């Protein structure tokens, strides 16, 4: 049985820009909290980054549920493309960046989010599925890959991956899609 839902499912405020500012503030609070968690060494840098990834990814994944227009989410993405670029360039917000390797995920994620919201906003279910995969499968693959032997490593461009991490990404993605 195929069915379609009407989006958004919930409008927290009459004006969408209030929702935008609440989400923006929430994301900034999460980033600041991650800095504190990193300084207090409550989590390892990679675990801290994964937790931030999941929380912020969940916020943006839910954007079609709380916004009628792609404009507020696209604006949010644009703001974080700029903020993440400057934070990365100036070695700020280490709680959201990988500590052990050079990665650009914190810059690529909002770029991908921007493209998806602008180009595919009318395909809400696909947007939610694709963002869910990025939000959930990526940190699971990272965790599995880091906690397995290095005997099964391979390199894509300059990134080292493991067969186990790749399998975890595939399995998680399959579960999300179906």
Residue ranges of each PLM-predicted region?
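Glycine-rich nucleotide/cofactor/substrate-binding loop typically near the N-terminus or early
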Residues: 77-83
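Glycine/aspartate-rich loop-and-adjacent alpha/beta segment that forms the canonical ThDP
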Residues: 26-30
